[in-house]
UniProtKB/Swiss-Prot annotation:
Homodimer. This is Tyrosine--tRNA ligase. A motif ('HIGH' region) lies at residues 39-48. InterPro entries: aa-tRNA-synth_I_CS, aa-tRNA-synth_Ic, Rossmann-like_a/b/a_fold, S4_RNA-bd_sf, SYY-like_C, Tyr-tRNA-ligase, Tyr-tRNA-ligase_bac-type, Tyr-tRNA-ligase_bac_1. Its EC number is 6.1.1.1. CDD domains: TyrRS_core. It is an enzyme of class 6 (ligase). One of its GO terms (molecular function) is ATP binding. PROSITE patterns: AA_TRNA_LIGASE_I (PS00178), S4 (PS50889). One of its GO terms (cellular component) is cytosol. It comes from Neisseria meningitidis serogroup C (strain 053442). HAMAP family: Tyr_tRNA_synth_type1 (MF_02006). Residues 353-422 form the S4 RNA-binding domain.
Length: 431
């Protein structure tokens, strides 16, 4: 199966230029292809995964991937289908983000062998280009009429109070020149990107033909949508980042575990390297079992292992199991740090707090009266163990102090998992 056929079988092709000619070229020879990543934050998020993984799929098929980090274009920001002007970031900020994203992209690709991946930065050529060169050598090849007719530009112009600055309007010229430059430097003949990049990609194809007299191709990947119409890649806490310090491996694992049944088999095709036959077998087994599908667990394991590694996957599984177990002794200090980052609602507490106060502080009870009822009915657990009276000498005027949180409840001297009922948790972080 060719790489194009594999992408088609996974429904990973939104648009291409001359797919038959591209497929024939890929079957005849190994090519260089690229995808650009603008540094708009200090980390990639799961919305970047499709193009990153597509580069990897092409490399596994023997082609040479080029990961282009937009040190120059990131100074402007792509306006494609954005409702308003992007905020401009300082050169120092963008440079720091460039380095972070380069480091994140590196593990996905192999930089050894005959088709070793290439890491490029468009600041290397735009940093040496002056304004007159840009207008003479690049600008003259672009029709303003054609640029105004691009859907992404028309949407901004037609939106009341929005408009588009010349800075953002010129973005497609910069991205278009990237293709021509990478074609000249490395022989790149294919640009891939998200479906919102189609206009920028075709601009690059046209410019490369004019400047280099070469036929090149474009391929876009689909916009990832969820069956319920909500945006993929967002949680109540915001974006799901690939950086473990911004989204913990545990939360990352949980994100995939919570994928809807209607989406999970599509996402297995989109994001994993399991074969179509393996995915079809998982779906058939799930349908035949009549019980909880296995697909979400497989997806969560595959993605967490791919992004964070085997050790992080084991930690995510350990945390997931321990939160609902009586014995939480297997949790490590690092596990608690993940929970404090984004795994559980976390609350700072001080010595002397009792369980009733902790329940109200964390929102696990709406009042002291309700909290006492939970405690008396044995519905409250501390680190997996039922909360019990442990302070017989409490003051008569403070009856709730009969169940006091003490040092014995502190894991690693700092953390206590408070649980009410089966699924309601909070993390107490001791000052």
């Amino acid at each position: 199966m060719s790489v194009i056929q594999d992408l088609q079988s996974r429904d990973l092709i939104a648009q291409t230029t001359d797919i038959e000619a591209l497929d024939a070229l890929l079957n005849e020879q190994k090519i260089a292809l690229y995808c650009g990543f603008d540094p708009t934050a200090d980390s990639l998020h799961i919305g970047h995964l499709l193009p990153v993984l597509a580069l990897r799929r092409f490399q596994q098929a023997g082609h040479t991937p080029i990961a282009l980090v937009g040190g120059a274009t990131g100074m402007i920001g792509d306006p494609s289908f954005k409702a308003a002007e992007r905020s401009l970031n300082s050169a120092e900020t963008v440079a720091g983000w460039v380095e972070s994203i380069r480091n994140q992209l590196t593990p996905f690709l192999s930089f050894e062998g005959g088709n070793a991946a290439i890491m490029a930065n468009n600041a290397d050529w735009f940093g040496k280009m002056n304004c007159l060169d840009f207008l003479r050598d690049i600008g003259k090849h672009f029709s303003v009429n054609a640029m105004l007719n691009k859907e992404s530009v028309k949407q901004r112009i037609d939106r009341d109070g929005a408009g588009i600055s010349f800075t953002e309007f010129a973005y497609s010229l910069l991205q278009g020149y990237d293709f021509a430059e990478l074609n000249k430097r490395y022989g790149a003949v294919l640009e891939i990107g998200g479906s919102d990049q189609w206009g920028n990609i075709t601009a690059g194809i046209d410019l490369t033909r004019r400047l280099n007299q070469k036929q090149v191709f474009g391929l876009t990947l689909p916009l990832v949508t969820k069956s319920d119409g909500t945006k993929f890649g967002k949680t109540e806490g915001g974006a799901v980042w690939l950086n473990a310090k911004k989204t913990s491996p545990y939360q990352f694992y949980q994100f995939w575990l919570k994928v809807a049944d209607a989406d999970v088999y599509k996402f297995l095709k989109y994001f994993t390297f399991l074969s179509i036959e393996e995915i079809d077998a998982v779906e058939a087994k799930d349908q035949a079992s009549g019980s909880k599908p296995e697909a979400q667990r497989i997806l969560a394991e595959e993605m967490t292992r791919l992004i964070h590694g085997e050790e992080a996957l084991a930690a995510a599984q350990r945390i997931s199991e321990s939160l609902f177990a009586e014995d939480q002794s297997s949790l490590t200090e690092s596990d608690f740090e993940q929970l404090a980052l984004d795994g559980l609602p976390a609350f700072e507490v001080s010595d002397g707090i009792n369980v009733v106060e902790a329940l109200v502080k964390t929102g696990l009870a709406s009042s002291n009266k309700e909290a006492r009822g939970f405690v008396n009915s044995k519905a409250v657990l501390l680190n997996g163990k039922p909360a019990e009276a442990n302070n017989p000498n409490h003051a008569a005027e403070r009856p709730d102090d009969a169940c006091l949180l003490t040092d014995e409840h502190k894991r690693f001297g700092k953390y206590t998992i408070l649980r009410r009922g089966k699924r309601n948790h909070a993390l107490l972080v001791w000052k």
